UniProtKB/Swiss-Prot annotation:
Gene expressing this chain: OPG075
Residues in Glutaredoxin domain copies: 3-106
Keyword Electron transport listed: yes
Family listed: Belongs to the glutaredoxin family.
Induction: Expressed in the intermediate phase of the viral replicative cycle.
Lineage: Viruses, Varidnaviria, Bamfordvirae, Nucleocytoviricota, Pokkesviricetes
UniProt keyword Zinc, yes or no: no
Subcellular location: Virion
Alphabetical keyword list: Disulfide bond, Electron transport, Redox-active center, Transport, Virion
Function: Has thioltransferase and dehydroascorbate reductase activities.
InterPro entries from the UniProt entry: GLR_AS, GLRX1, Glutaredoxin, Glutaredoxin_euk/vir, Glutaredoxin_subgr, Thioredoxin-like_sf
Species of the source: Cowpox virus (strain Brighton Red)
MF GO annotations: glutathione disulfide oxidoreductase activity
Protein name: Glutaredoxin-1
Gene3D superfamilies membership: Glutaredoxin
GO terms under cellular component: virion component
């Protein structure tokens, strides 16, 4: 059931971030991503409160990404990890290039 919940939300040419809005790391990750202008439908924020039991979802995250914590961030169907991973990419000034290369940013 957790697999279906996650896989239905992942797609090529899309950024998906699984969050808990009470989590400061999730809010920080959203702040980074919200600096960019995404094409309609190319960016989805999923509150993990939508899924019960939460532990089942976290177990599935661990199975496919190696981590149970949120945020869990996916570029297409590929996990890039969590907040610290996103921050590292952003600090290298590579995030915009990566997002452009997967076709999720507006060009105008």
């Amino acid at each position: 059931m957790a697999e279906e919940f996650v896989q239905q939300r992942l797609a090529n040419n899309k950024v998906t971030i699984f969050v808990k809005f009470t989590c400061p790391f999730c809010r920080n990750a959203l702040d980074i991503l919200n600096k960019f202008s995404f094409k309609r439908g190319a960016y989805e924020i999923v509150d993990i409160k939508e899924f019960r039991p939460e532990n089942e979802l976290r177990d599935y995250f661990e199975q496919i990404t190696g981590g149970r914590t949120v945020p869990r961030i996916f570029f297409g169907k590929t996990s890039i990890g969590g907040y610290s991973d996103l921050l590292e990419i952003d600090n290298m000034d590579a995030l915009g290039d990566i997002l452009s290369s997967i076709g999720v940013l507006r060009t105008c």
